[in-house]
């Protein structure tokens, strides 16, 4: 596994590399280029606390695997999201020699996680994830995988929307018992569930509108933005990744 910026600084501190060598390596570490088409920001995690992630939409399978492996080489673990042909990726990745890696393909979320077997993700807290319906689960799973690479445990409860609100209370009780630092709430249709949750808890709620609804797909987004319950942040439609990042950063701050 290659060295990231933190590893280089520790090596310099311990006297393992010279000043000239660390200067050279830092310059080389600004980004990694793959066949002039992909430029990976490999030190994003050091700057922002959030690792570079491969956005799979519009990329072919070979590009996705190469880019993800390059990030793993530098950071130990990497995620690819919005993979359009997840079945093809599942078939193609078997042809690669990846015996030194743990591979997780989430067909529902259309994500790929590759981790070096020698890399251990530092655990930094817990986040709750709720969905209104089963149709919202793919977006919730994308958020869950994002949290996983950030070292955050996801406590999940799916299909607990307001059409059968009695289903919600045991799930919410468990979230409180698990001491989650915030709750991601994924909902389509009219998008009311985040407002209900925010009226019951004293922690941040992150609303994720989904496109799984009748009529105009923007409806749940507008509902969440116009909520009368304070304490809700809202990401864009189907943006499980963005919700996972936001929640992961909250967990990171709480862990300090």
Swiss-Prot record:
Does the keyword Cell membrane feature in the UniProt annotation? yes
Q: Subcellular localization, per the record?
A: Cell membrane
Question: GO MF terms on file?
Answer: hydrolase activity
Show the InterPro entries listed in the entry. Answer: P2CMN_synthase_LarB (IPR039476), PurE_dom (IPR000031)
Q: How does it sit in the membrane?
A: Multi-pass membrane protein
Q: Which Gene3D superfamilies would you find in this protein's record?
A: 3.40.50.1970
A single Gene Ontology biological process assigned to it is: 'de novo' IMP biosynthetic process
Name the keywords, alphabetized.
Answer: Cell membrane, Membrane, Transmembrane, Transmembrane helix
- One of the record's GO cellular component terms: plasma membrane
Task: Quote the NCBIfam families the UniProt record gives.
Answer: LarB
Name of protein: Uncharacterized protein MJ0165
Species whose genome carries this gene: Methanocaldococcus jannaschii (strain ATCC 43067 / DSM 2661 / JAL-1 / JCM 10045 / NBRC 100440) (Methanococcus jannaschii)
């Amino acid at each position: 596994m290659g060295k990231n910026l933190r590893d280089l600084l520790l090596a310099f501190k311990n006297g393992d590399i010279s000043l000239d060598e660390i200067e050279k390596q830092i310059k080389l570490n600004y980004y990694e280029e793959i066949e002039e088409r992909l430029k990976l920001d490999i030190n994003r995690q050091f700057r922002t606390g959030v690792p570079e992630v491969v956005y799979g939409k519009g990329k072919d399978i070979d590009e996705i695997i190469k880019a993800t492996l390059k990030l793993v080489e530098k950071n130990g673990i990497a995620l690819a999201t919005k993979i359009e042909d997840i079945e093809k990726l599942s078939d193609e990745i078997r042809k690669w020699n990846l015996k030194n890696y743990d591979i997780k393909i989430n067909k529902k979320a259309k994500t790929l996680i590759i981790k070096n077997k020698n890399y251990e993700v530092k655990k930094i807290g817990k986040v709750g994830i709720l969905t209104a319906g089963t149709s919202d689960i793919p977006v919730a799973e994308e958020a869950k995988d994002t949290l996983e690479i950030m070292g955050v445990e996801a406590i999940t409860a799916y299909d607990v929307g307001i059409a059968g609100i009695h289903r919600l209370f045991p799930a919410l009780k468990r979230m409180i018992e698990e001491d989650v630092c915030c709750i991601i709430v994924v909902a389509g249709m009219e998008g009311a569930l985040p407002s209900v949750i925010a009226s019951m808890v004293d922690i941040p709620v992150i609303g994720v509108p989904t496109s799984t609804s009748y009529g105009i797909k923007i409806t749940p987004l507008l509902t969440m933005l116009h909520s009368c319950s304070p304490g809700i942040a809202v990401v864009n439609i189907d943006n499980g990744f963005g919700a996972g990042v936001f929640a992961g950063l909250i967990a990171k701050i709480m862990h300090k």
